[in-house]
């Protein structure tokens, strides 16, 4: 109801709409809003209404929106913006780690046995969002510092050059010190000047727990 009221208000005010949705691989929200957009398009035929499944989450979706805003300021039309997002969404790399495996167990991401064993052995998973928009475990490292460094290592392997010119987003689950550590590593290793740090959003944070750390940047590919 809130989404419909927002979209309807924009359309009634004579605005066109480009909806960039949270990954359909992690939520049913995109499908619901896309259906709503189609219904409203029939009701407001004089307006342009587009929806794009970003296949992204958290700061990854935010960074994709940030890039879209820059393109809009450069003068791209709404159709060109839609096409740009569709063409570049799989260049948006998401690399995550978590500090408490029990949150992943409660969310069904790992088994209870794996969560307990990993906790005892101080194992930290490194995860990413794949081309279908799913959150996938990629590797395991021992110790928090190694998991933070692993995020930056992945950026070194895949970031689109010139890396120093990129805008990088970092989100964290109430662990600002770790976020600043990763930001410093990104600045030191790649010369990046524009690093934006923010809290992980509540929905993601509820599933991943305190200590969640995520790094987002533009990459040759997500893998």
Predicted regions and their residues:
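A glycine-rich beta-strand to alpha-helix segment
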Residues: 21, 50-51
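Class I S-adenosyl-L-methionine
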Residues: 1-42
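Mixed-charge interfacial surface used for oligomerization/domain docking
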Residues: 26-29, 33-39, 44-50, 56-223
């Amino acid at each position: 109801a809130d989404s419909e009221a927002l979209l309807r208000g924009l359309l009634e005010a004579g605005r066109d709409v480009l909806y960039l949705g949270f990954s359909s691989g992690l939520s049913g929200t995109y499908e619901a809003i896309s259906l709503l957009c189609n219904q409203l398009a029939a009701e407001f035929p004089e307006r342009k209404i587009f929806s794009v499944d970003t296949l992204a989450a958290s700061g990854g979706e935010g960074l994709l929106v940030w890039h879209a805003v820059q393109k809009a300021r450069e003068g791209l039309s709404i159709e060109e913006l839609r096409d740009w997002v569709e063409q570049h969404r799989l260049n948006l790399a998401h690399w995550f780690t978590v500090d408490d495996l029990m949150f992943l167990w409660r969310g069904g991401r790992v088994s209870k046995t794996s969560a307990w064993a990993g906790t005892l052995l101080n194992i930290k998973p490194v995860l990413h969002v794949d081309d279908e928009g799913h959150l996938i475990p990629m590797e395991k490292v021992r110790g928090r510092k190694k998991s933070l460094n692993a995020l930056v290592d992945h950026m070194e392997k895949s970031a689109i050059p010139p890396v120093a010119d990129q805008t990088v987003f970092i989100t964290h689950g109430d662990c600002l010190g770790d976020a600043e550590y990763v930001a410093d590593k990104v600045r030191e290793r790649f010369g990046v000047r524009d690093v934006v740090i923010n809290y992980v959003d509540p929905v993601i944070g509820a599933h991943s727990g305190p200590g969640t750390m995520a790094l987002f940047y533009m990459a040759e590919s997500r893998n």
